[in-house]
């Protein structure tokens, strides 16, 4: 280990100790049972109705009209934002007759002269179509086109198109009007009874695919009239009539017709097959119907609460029935009575009907997960000497890449991935390596690359679509609707924009001044608003375009019709957006945005692990469990594949990328390991693309040692690294989770939250703090477990190892209690503290101690810093060289230059280069061999910087001893590299590569013309 890195690590340890943060430990579990009557104290602020911004995006992006216009939308509604990824969108596109999937029912407009209106369909699990070609089924779907019952009326024909209005994130209203008559239905997700409101109309109830086996009038309810109808598939439906007097009669085996013109409403509900109690429950809750659903929410401690608040009509003295999905049944805590009525959902397991005007749910949230790796086991993130060295080396290589050129692509998706790669690199350098100089260089390069997009100068700029109201790429507006994965048609916006929001959060984290510079904040907020605007008070975007709070995850597809409804191909890019949004809210100080994202992430962990990731407690068919992930989840179908191929690494991997600190919150270690052992371990050696490294990075969640060994291998093949992935970050992620032989523990935000179980309750955790970092002396491998005997600024500590000075924990080292000086801990026998600044104690008996973190260079390897004065009296202990303190046992200060002491020899300075005076002499700023010394001569090159583009270096005789030289701001070994201006090029087999522009090249293969490489 180099003396540079040793000093660097000790400096980091000093800073880490001074900034110890609490590691959260479980002390007590608070269980909220389903249907309990606990009192919830809500905050004044509803984070689901907090405006992000109201700036008109057209003023930044300009505006266009979209080539696809909403079909059937009322004139008044056209002026408002229109949802583009919701269950009812098929009715706004194309022929408008495709299916609308409002779990647990399917609806569609049946355009007909004889049976026109809205069809209702529901199928049970035994009607599901399963893949029978494979031993492990790769797909299933629910049969479509079965019109169990439908609402119609005399006078509705194929020319009577429904008008859509009252469009919201969970509902829309459909109105058929003819002459002076109308039929109106509000369709919502989860509604247990379907209601049609009639005005001056003769109702018709029909089925275009089934026949009526039995139809009877049933007395004894609050309804004007009630009927029970049994269809030819043996399913039983109930019909309730409210309003004017009306009698239904069976006109044909497929049609019930009203006796007269009617003003009122009719409700239809399905009795689960064989359920003898459901009818009485429906009778209790009939008469009321839902016309709208609003969402509210807040965060309290480490729990996120969200509520569905229903707007109702009809008999509002009655609470409405509403179907809950499995992840909601597990977490409902207030406002509802869960009934025994159970219907199968489309692809999300069994649903329970619950009664209530407002239903509140509680989810454990990732409140303390930030930019550093997070351990799902509650372990401490730590790094060994070896890991830090390898991470630094790899990060230095990646830092040399051209951020701007690599991210200047013709796709928002791919550009975003590259930017996020470099964001993770900057996090690695800044938060883990603690290299301020390289961090500054990294973030400046990242800001420059990001600026192209803020300035809207990318290959395909963004524009504001004034038709549907959103920010889209221009790539597909004039021809290919699938350009950039359909971004122009609102497909995958959460996948695309999540990378940009995450990158912006990293920049704001490292350089807070950037946030309010120019249009940076507004531009990022435009993306947040496009994907997840929470409020109707923002007139420029629909609410929650890409997230379905009811289902607990996002939907894609946008403005494309689909028989099976919207779909989700990548769970991980879904939650990546909300992780980026959480961090962005944090760095800009928008606590409502941060809380909202935390709640959504808590919901997604629960929902995704029940429906799309086949973890313990998931609801998918047992026969499909060996697939481990759904693949593509449609509203009506699951198929174990991708849109771009059927390789197993594609199907599993698209649910992994990108690997960030939130990954382990969603993807538990047991799930990751089971998936690896069953599907991936046997094929990993045959994966010859960037997917291989992604699979290994994901493995770090369960087996960090194996992941680390892969990424730290000396023969690591960069061909197996995706363009959107940073090897330095993958190393930092795996090494931090492994924490083997750790000597350094970065300030961490680790927390332990208990996932909700499948037994109908949610477990949340209250926490207490213990010290999360310790000072390893002589590089002890792991923190020592000790007894707790003190409290310092909320952190408990062992008073035999630490002292509390003010609010800072400082160590006791060799019996000496270190003291606090403005956040830094110091040995009082070696330092003094004057006005918050450390200074050395001038004493001939001082000994070497921990040094402050040295300023490091752009190559990431920590190095000495040049100074402005000369210190002549050298001795061991801490000395002052200009404004920098250094360990005089390891460095020598000579003429504004810190040079190392190697093998007892004080190296001297010569025009920026450090040299061994027994081997070299310095004359007029140039080094030449010391001819007095007898050495074995070799050929090397002068380290003096040159200024030409492709210079021929001057060779000199030299010894085999290294010369430590400086090139620009980087230090290098002159036997391995040569400096051209500020460009370092390697020496390979004794021959130096030449420089051309910023590239190094072999002159036997290439030439250089005007700063560009050409064939030799």
UniProtKB/Swiss-Prot annotation:
Does the keyword field hold Oxidoreductase?
A: no
> Which residues does the annotated region (alpha/beta subdomain) include?
273-364
From the UniProt entry, list the residue stretches annotated as the region Required for catalytic activity against insoluble beta-glucan and to restrict localization of the enzyme to the cell septum: 748-1016
Provide the residue span(s) of the region labelled Disordered: 844-872
**What biological function has been recorded for the protein in this entry?**
Cleaves internal linkages in 1,3-beta-glucan. Has a role in cell separation where it is required for the degradation of the primary septum after completion of cytokinesis.
User: Chief subcellular site?
Assistant: other
Region labeled beta-sandwich subdomain — which residues? 45-272
User: Which residues does the annotated region ((alpha/beta)6 barrel subdomain) include?
Assistant: 379-741
Organism, as annotated: Schizosaccharomyces pombe (strain 972 / ATCC 24843) (Fission yeast)
Q: What is its EC number?
A: 3.2.1.39
GH81 domain: which residues? 45-741
Tell me which positions the record assigns to the signal sequence: 1-20
Quickly give the catalysed reaction. Answer: Hydrolysis of (1->3)-beta-D-glucosidic linkages in (1->3)-beta-D-glucans
Q: What is this protein called?
A: Primary septum glucan endo-1,3-beta-D-glucosidase
Keywords from the UniProt entry: Carbohydrate metabolism, Cell cycle, Cell division, Cell wall biogenesis/degradation, Glycoprotein, Glycosidase, Hydrolase, Polysaccharide degradation, Signal
Q: Which family does it belong to?
A: Belongs to the glycosyl hydrolase 81 family.
Asked whether the UniProt record includes Hydrolase among its keywords, one would answer: yes
* Cellular component terms per the entry's GO annotation: cell surface; division septum; extracellular region; mating projection actin fusion focus; primary cell septum
Q: What happens when the gene is disrupted?
A: Decreases basal endo-1,3-beta-glucanase activity. Cells do not separate normally after cytokinesis resulting in chained cells.
InterPro entries per the UniProt record, alphabetical: Endo-beta-glucanase (IPR005200), Eng1_septum (IPR018909), GH81_C (IPR040720), GH81_N (IPR040451)
The active site annotation covers: 492, 569, 573
Binding positions ((1,3-beta-D-glucosyl)n): 496, 567, 569, 573, 650
